[in-house]
């Protein structure tokens, strides 16, 4: 059993696994002053929109949007064996992840299902040497920063606490907020606020930076398909940072509604909808999260079950659908080929960028080829649909020159 604690010093064994009452975010008052419409989501009161979902969606695609994602769980796993222990639970290569680099990964169940998807960063600190003492610079204690889904964080913490060894420590960074600055002008705006900090950063780089008295972790990543940054900040400074960023002409606050339509266009799955404990990484088209060497060698929870799917092929696959007309297909809509049901929609909506309905669905593997003509049932009507490659809108991550 892993040693674990929250930043305030509480042992996580005393934490409630589920939150019955709706919580508020550190920026709750800030959102309300900005005119946000607040709704319950993942146990928190969160802004679904400010000016309007389509306006905010298009602004993010054209300029830069600021999202409050403080509901998500920020965790730190530390200890000499941290990478080894995480590799028992995650199918990606953690030990080879270089300091300052981030990787998308999956928390796996023994059944081969997905307990959650997450981002993991090698946060091992560099300790500067001291010429007077004759000490050389060196890497400190191994540390891995993880961002998990808000609705699953308590389950994730319990799972990690149960399966990680006593030699590592799990810390829940409850006293930190998380802001995401996304869009083609995100770097321009952030560079104006924090000069020379992000100049050399590419997609999935992560740095620690003291902005005055604010200790920040800045990671070049996001959930929109655009270039952008996720900024972990002490909760007490979150409002001041949000004000500084929104003072830039390119930046506006953006709500959950646009976040969902942006990630749908980007072909990014939403946990609890497009991926669940009942879906495996192969069927979910997340094979890239299974590092080749670890896919072959195993040693991680769920490997045997996933290996069988890899060998036999998945029964269904997650695909994109472009739907004719203007009527969006929502989660649960059935997919047909003639009279035969061949799938089900897991996410769907109207794409402001493409100006047409799009969806993600699981369909029978034999019908998962790009260009396959299908039908989706919406309000008792069959709408023509075509299997499409994802992302629907090309990603614009900054990968360097």
In which residue ranges do the predicted regions lie?
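Internal amphipathic helical hairpin motif
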Residues: 80-116, 186-214
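Glycine-rich, Trp-frequent "lid" loop and neighboring beta-strands that shape
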Residues: 119-120
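Acidic, proline/glycine-enriched N-terminal capping motif
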Residues: 2-105, 113, 124, 257
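Short coil/turn segments at secondary-structure boundaries
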Residues: 73, 77, 115, 144-151
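Conserved, structured C-terminal
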Residues: 2, 7-40, 47-48, 123-401
